[in-house]
UniProtKB/Swiss-Prot annotation:
Source taxonomy: Eukaryota, Metazoa, Chordata, Craniata, Vertebrata
Region spans: Involved in HAX-1 binding: 27-66
Function of the protein: Substrate of the antigen receptor-coupled tyrosine kinase. Plays a role in antigen receptor signaling for both clonal expansion and deletion in lymphoid cells. May also be involved in the regulation of gene expression.
Residues covered by the SH3 domain: 429-486
Main location: mitochondrion
Phosphothreonine modified-residue sites: 330
GO cellular component: cytoplasm; cytosol; mitochondrion; nucleus; plasma membrane; transcription regulator complex
Acidic residues: bias regions: 368-413
A Pfam family of this chain: HS1_rep
Keyword Magnesium: no
Name this polypeptide is given: Hematopoietic lineage cell-specific protein
Keywords for this protein: Acetylation, Mitochondrion, Phosphoprotein, Repeat, SH3 domain
Length: 486
């Protein structure tokens, strides 16, 4: 331990005082909630002020000002006291030798004011003896001698009209001199020169320069810009490439399709007219001899074989659902042959939403009607729904129809097959699968996207060139010529 600490006991007593935040015991909170919120009442030490009454404040200030002025007049010095100035009243303190304010002194005038004839300055001074003898009087008028050029205009050598030729610069040219600038060589002889197209001095032309007659045909440096979407997606770029290459072919196919649709429309009207005239029970359809070309016939490879047939009375309903289907694989076989020869994807078929809607409506409406088996359910339909009645009578006229009418409507295998797949294919096309031949990226939310060798199930043939199916959990439209049925 340090020596300074030995023998010393330091203890500091700390007084315990009350908390500064405690309120006084006699405090009474007489302030309302509104006054507490807005500080409308003054509290000592609160730092808040009460609302100001401006009228009361003005009166109070005016009264305080009057009181202050009265005190200043009473206690301050009085203006009447003093002896200085004109109004000083303490006369006993004034200087006895001082002149008062009522004294007016007369100042003597100057001699020039008392006698105007006196003085020697100026024009009218009369004291000539005092004027400067060498000074010129006011009556003197000095005349400046004119310059020689003012007296005789023929004098001088400057300018155009100067006559003193001896004073001029011998090397200077006169005003009568006209200088002629020598023309350039190209102005004197146009045949000279080597520049431009018509220069004749070929020996001066650059040997390595290309002549004007050797100019090649101008070519464009334009490069077609590739969109970001096409650059990022190989399938989209490939699709755009073949769409541009097959532009003419697609137009030709659209024209053929329009003609075919018009011909089919006329055929339908003729068949409907014949079906209305003929009223006879439906007969079993015999399989007609297949002609050389059947563009709209559904092959047996596409549909599974039919195991059972419905009674003849239900044939109108079968034909009603089957009617838009036969035109589906019209372009499949030629496109498949084309794809086998060429690995490039074909052009997309035209999007015809009108055709898709026409095909879909009878399929979805006719599906629930196949459930009841009794025959009377199928007979009254043609009376209530004339559109279905017209289409439903197609199978009954197979024997009476001529040529193309028999080709459009299939024999017994196709109607029975269509009816058998009605409940499933009509709603979703279940049971039909296909494998993708090319890569396709759907452009819209209702289109399907797939890669090569992908399996597409639940195919519904809703249009000639566009089918609807399911792939990778998505359901949508896709081009029929991009896939091959299994």
């Amino acid at each position: 331990m340090w020596k300074s600490v030995v023998g010393h006991d330091v203890s500091v007593s700390v007084e315990t005082q009350g908390d500064d935040w405690d309120t006084d015991p006699d405090f009474v909170n007489d302030i309302s909630e509104k006054e507490q919120r807005w500080g409308a009442k003054t509290i000592e030490g609160s730092g808040r002020t009460e609302h100001i009454n401006i009228h009361q404040l003005r009166n109070k200030v005016s009264e305080e000002h009057d009181i202050l002025k009265k005190k200043e007049l009473e206690s301050g010095p009085k203006a009447s006291h003093g002896y200085g100035g004109r109004f000083g009243v303490e006369r006993d303190r004034m200087d006895k030798s001082a002149v008062g304010h009522e004294y007016v002194a007369d100042v003597e005038k100057h001699s020039s004011q008392t006698d105007a004839a006196r003085g020697f300055g100026g024009k009218y001074g009369v004291e000539r003896d005092r004027a400067d003898k060498s000074a010129v009087g006011f009556d003197y008028k000095g005349e400046v001698e004119k310059h020689a050029s003012q007296k005789d205009y023929s004098h001088g050598f400057g300018g155009r009209y100067g006559v003193e030729k001896d004073k001029r610069d011998k090397a200077a040219l006169g005003y009568d001199y006209k200088g002629e600038t020598e023309k350039h060589e190209s102005q004197r002889d146009y045949a000279k020169g080597f520049g431009g197209q018509y220069g004749i001095q070929k020996d001066r032309v650059d040997k390595s320069a290309v002549g004007f007659n050797e100019m090649e045909a101008p070519t464009t440096a334009y490069k077609k810009t590739t969109p970001i979407e096409a650059a990022s997606s190989g399938a989209r770029g490939l699709k755009a490439k073949f769409e541009s290459l097959a532009e003419e072919k697609r137009k030709r196919e659209e024209e053929e399709k329009a003609q075919q649709m018009a011909r089919q429309q006329q055929e339908r009207k003729a068949v409907v007219k014949m079906s209305r005239e003929v009223q006879q029970p439906s007969m079993p359809v015999e399989e007609p001899a297949a002609p050389a070309q059947l563009p709209k016939k559904i092959s047996s490879e596409v549909w599974p074989p039919a195991e059972s047939h419905l009674p003849p009375e239900s044939q109108p309903v079968r034909s009603r659902r089957e009617y838009p289907v036969p035109s589906l694989p019209t372009r499949q076989s030629p496109l498949q042959n084309h794809l086998e020869d060429n690995e490039e994807p074909p052009a997309l078929p035209p999007r015809t939403p009108e055709g898709l809607q026409v095909v879909e409506e009878p399929v979805y409406e006719a599906a629930p009607e196949l459930e009841p088996e009794p025959e009377p359910d199928y007979e009254p339909e043609p009376e209530t729904e004339p559109d279905y009645e017209d289409v439903g009578e197609l199978d009954r006229q197979d024997e009476d129809a001529e040529g193309d009418y028999e080709d459009v409507l299939e024999p017994e295998d196709t109607p029975s097959l269509s009816y058998q797949a009605g409940p499933s294919a009509g709603a979703g096309g279940a049971g039909i699968s296909a494998i993708a031949l090319y890569d396709y990226q759907g452009e819209g939310s209702d289109e399907l996207s797939f890669d090569p060798d992908d399996i597409i199930t639940d195919i519904e043939m809703v249009d000639e060139g566009w089918w609807r199916g399911q792939c990778r959990g998505h359901f949508g439209l896709f081009p029929a010529n991009y896939v091959k049925l299994l």
